[in-house]
Amino acid sequence: MILQDEVLMTTLYLNEQQSIVKKRDGYLIVQYPDKRTVEVPLVKVSQVVVSGDVTLTTPALHTLLGMGIEVCFLSMYGQFRGRLSPPVAKNVFLRREQYRVHADQQCALKVAQACVRGKLENMRTMLLRANRSLQDPEVADATVTMQHMIRQVSCASTVGSLLGIEGNGSAAYFGVFGKLVRGSMVFTHRRRRPPTDPINAMLSLGYTLLLHQVSAAIQVVGLDPYVGFLHQPRYGRPALALDVMEEFRPIIADSVVLNIVNHRILTEQDFQEELGVVHLKPEARKTFYAKFEERLQEELQHPYFDYRTSYRRCIELQVRLLGKWLTGEIPHYLPLSVR
């Protein structure tokens, strides 16, 4: 399956097993096992996501890297396997400031607080929106708890205490997330490794795709994705990407999942269990990718710049704002908080 917009540069999702992707002139040529072929103009591709047994030829990979296009590799079931990235951007001075702030605990704490505040505010907004029609007292109580957690963010004196606040706020949110779900699917709690029900399976896949979007934006701006402020560096862990991703989790990934479930776009029959782990079936993954891409292209009124732009563009704007704060061009890093 290929998903891409006819006009905008978007993510190219390669999901058809045993496909081969070649490069010819200004196109990627996707050859399917049944001999069908599809031509994709390279000028319309900003990123590539490969799921499972899909082969990209060396010329295709060289062309993508030469154009600065990242390739993300997932397993057939959507687990992250790795990323092929172009050379790091040449702005060494920006990364030097990133490393300096990372080493300064108080400066790093300011960024970490902004990331947590943005996440909790957007989680709370999701609950407030849903409860306009639900009128559920438990959801209302959760919004009060989360407002209390948001107020505590600025009082946190260490990243450790901040993570505790984030954990309490997330627990309140996911404690009532199941009440936002309509229909026969059930959500009781967040289960990451492994996902054992359809909603957790979709949340995990959504977060994986979101992490790739954020990592690609960080690559474009020229920051180091492995040096963060909230998430501490660990071997192979894209800490900065996880930091920036926090404020987008509820308004992109969670929103996609609720849309799919509540409009019965996917049902329990679109999932399969293997060794206690629940996965989306191949056709269901195609649908999920399409809905995720739709959300990235959806526009909103940007709260700081006062113009309409897409969620995909908002991700890059947030990374650029972080870069400007690191270099002292703006006084604060403000997370993207929606209303």
What are these regions (language model features)?
Residues I2-R24, P33, E39, K90-R339:
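Active-site helix-to-loop segments that bind/position phosphate- or nucleotide-bearing substrates
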Residues K44-Q47, G52-T125:
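A surface-exposed, charged beta-strand/loop segment in the N-terminal or early-internal portion
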Residues K22-V54:
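N-terminal ordered "arm"
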